[in-house]
Amino acid sequence: MDLKLYDTLTKDKRAFVPLDPRNVRMYVCGPTVYDFAHIGNARPVIVFDVLFRLLRHIYGDSHVTYVRNITDVDDKINDRALRDYPGLPLNEAIRKVTEKTATQFRADVDALGCLQPTVEPRATDFVLPRPDGKTDMVSLIKTLIDRGHAYEANGEVLFDTASMPDYGQLSGRKLEEQQAGARIAVDAHKKHAADFVLWKQSSADEPGWDSPWGRGRPGWHIECSAMSAAYLGETFDIHGGGLDLIFPHHENEIAQSRCAHGTHAMANYWLHNGFLQVEGEKMSKSLGNFVTINELLQDWPGEVVRLNMLKTHYRSPIDWTLKGLEESAKALDDWYATAGDAAGSAPADTVMETLCDDLNTAQTVAALHGLRHQAEKGDAAQRDQLAASLRFLGFFSETKDAWDARKREASGVDAAQVTALIADRTAARARKDWKESDRIRDELAAMGVAIKDSKEGTTWEIAR
């Protein structure tokens, strides 16, 4: 089956044809580690993990390179370092901030069932020319100046957007129509309002590197142009990120990379996931609905969070609700109950078909429910396919018994008490005391325990 992906640049869904099937290359913008990642940050992590898994399935594990960067130089990081570690030298304070948040981010990603990317470069390692000759930011800026695409002004180096005739293709913003806005800083020394910073001066209390333009630090956009080229080359297959990055970040990445390398494209496919809101409102600290991934994982297993993300197509907006989490938890309970201890074979064709249709995970989840219904009727093959499909998607990371034990522990239900009540109920049923049997059943239900009678005896689980 052919993989089709929606390309933001061309505005259509088309067949994915890699530049080299033996070396499929994908870059996704990672976190800026000034604070712990929030649930909105989890969406691209999960979405592009599924794509990474799918590409590996199609082309082979060793033939796919996935780069997701860590931005560890940023004005917000600088502010956080000065606030949290006022007594330390700035560079040491910055490292403390970024190490703590980057370590937590990796732990969050693991808990969400995501594979680690092939490479996870840090921006600070690519500012200056490197011993290994990989692309760096200073050299890239020099090239842009030499080719007439950048200029020095007021101690900064800026990209000359007018030097690129088709600037604005990704976002659909024509250069002449662009006005100063919230994300475009307008200064008198700019040739055009849309010109953006490649290199800026650093004061004594800001991080900086010595460069041909004085001590300073890179602009946001040049970082990803350098790191992607360093590992994936001048043109690669897929570039991903959130919708909020289309402009200005990805637009400016394209401008820098194409103009520096003289290429027709930076990436051949541009994928963007939709926005996330919480209970119908924009997530923000001021509304009190700002939740970090780590905070969410204190209350919900990573697999529940993962499924809740994947129930919605990645390009659609998602409303993050408690009801949705509860429904996702119930679905996983059902899947574990049906196939949690199945050996598994290969993912079902219906699952792979939905994924190959622009990562239509909403339909994938529907296909998983269909497999479960067939498995519940005694279809062993469907049961194995359900288990294999879920493992392929990053679920079933633990045994059925471990999943059930986790659920019981989280519920606070006393397992010994439940076992004793079930024994009392079994005895009541044996003497045909149906009133007592029903009373015990109701008592268990009030505790949040659901029971199931079969020829083998009575089993129980925590009711969601």
UniProtKB/Swiss-Prot annotation:
Cofactor(s) annotated in UniProt: Zn(2+)
Disulfide cross-links: none
Motif ('KMSKS' region): 282-286
UniProt xrefs under InterPro entries: Cys-tRNA-ligase (IPR015803), Cys-tRNA-synt_Ia_DALR (IPR015273), Cys-tRNA/MSH_ligase (IPR024909), CysS_C (IPR056411), Rossmann-like_a/b/a_fold (IPR014729), tRNA-synt_1_cat_dom (IPR032678), tRNAsynth_Ia_anticodon-bd (IPR009080)
GO biological process: cysteinyl-tRNA aminoacylation
One cellular-component annotation, GO: cytosol
Major enzyme class: ligase
GO MF entry, a single one: zinc ion binding
Keyword Zinc appears in the UniProt entry: yes
Keyword presence, Aminoacyl-tRNA synthetase: yes
Protein's cellular compartments: Cytoplasm
Matches recorded under Pfam families: CysS_C, DALR_2, tRNA-synt_1e
Keywords of this entry: Aminoacyl-tRNA synthetase, ATP-binding, Cytoplasm, Ligase, Metal-binding, Nucleotide-binding, Protein biosynthesis, Zinc
Binding-site residues for ATP, renumbered to this chain: 285
Catalytic activity field: tRNA(Cys) + L-cysteine + ATP = L-cysteinyl-tRNA(Cys) + AMP + diphosphate
Motif ('HIGH' region): 31-41
Main subcellular localisation: cytoplasm
Free-text remark on how the cofactor is bound: Binds 1 zinc ion per subunit.
EC number in record: 6.1.1.16
Subunit structure: Monomer.
Protein name: Cysteine--tRNA ligase
